[in-house]
Amino acid sequence: MASPVTVLENPIPKSGQHLLFFLTSKQQLALEQRPIESSLGYSAYVDHGVSQGVIVNPSSIAAAMRSSLVTVYGITKPGTDKQYISVISPTYNLIANRQNQPIETTQKALAACSDNDRNNWVYYLNLPQGTPQYAIYELNIQDSSSAPTVYSGPTPSGNSNLAAVYFSPNKDRFIIFSNTDTRHYLYWVNSTLQSANRISGTGSVMSASPLAATTITNVQTRSMTIFLYYMDVNTLLNRIVGKVTDNEIHWYANQVVEGAPPMKVDTLLTGVVVEGKWNCLYYIPDGDTEFRAFNDTIRDSFFDEPREG
């Protein structure tokens, strides 16, 4: 029986794509990004199956641009003890390795970043076989995913959340997490060097704090500014700013975000830069039940020199 089908032009400017939706042989929604110039090739949709069950909560979801399309990743659970990394929008599909096996995770953390072209990188936590220490895992997702890369150097806590950003001048990624210290400092790791580096001034971070990172890249100076937001032990929204050059980040002083409402203790956090002038943060304030927006205007005072603590 022929599949239902519909198509529209990708609204992203200059994408040069048609978005073709249809049903697979398993009667699940598929999406192919077909070039408007039909002589160009395309990648056929591969159906890895739908995870019967729910999107895990508490957990994390992460969105990134890939091939001019917004893709949302999540952790799904098919009613057993196993949890899988999945695409949950614009289609719903398990992510599989090259052996067509779904990618498992035991934890709630998930982050993603993009080169704004064909590559997404998805980060999650797992226990490497035979070890008691959680590690950061990286999936490079193009038209399909590769085998996970394990970052063996960093030692994230099992309840850590993750944030990830892409540095286009070096084609590097920076991943941020909380460590297994008695005080849960935040750390960063570079995808090339893979060694953990403590962020001074973040010793007040709440255990299992949500993390959000936004960026502004300066192509001329080959540098990038990272705005990292987290919850402290008093449930206040904190900000710390880092300047990326080459493989290093120079961090400035952490600050409580002025005027931001206290955070609900189990809220997650996300943010986006608006016109290079302010960061729009979304989180659930204490005593509320819905995500609210808070605008944090970028100021010179963000770049005070760092201090220990």
From Swiss-Prot:
EC number(s) on file: 3.4.21.-
Residues bearing attached sugar chains per UniProt: N190, N295
Keywords: Cell wall, Glycoprotein, Hydrolase, Membrane, Protease, Secreted, Serine protease, Signal
Gene Ontology cellular component terms for the protein in this record: extracellular region; membrane
Organism in which the protein naturally occurs: Coccidioides immitis (strain RS) (Valley fever fungus)
UniProt function note: May participate in wall plasticization and/or intussusception or in cell wall turnover.
One of the protein's GO biological processes: proteolysis
Location(s) in or outside the cell: Secreted, Cell wall; Membrane
Molecular-function annotations in GO: serine-type peptidase activity
Membrane-topology descriptor: Peripheral membrane protein
Identification of the protein by name: Wall-associated proteinase
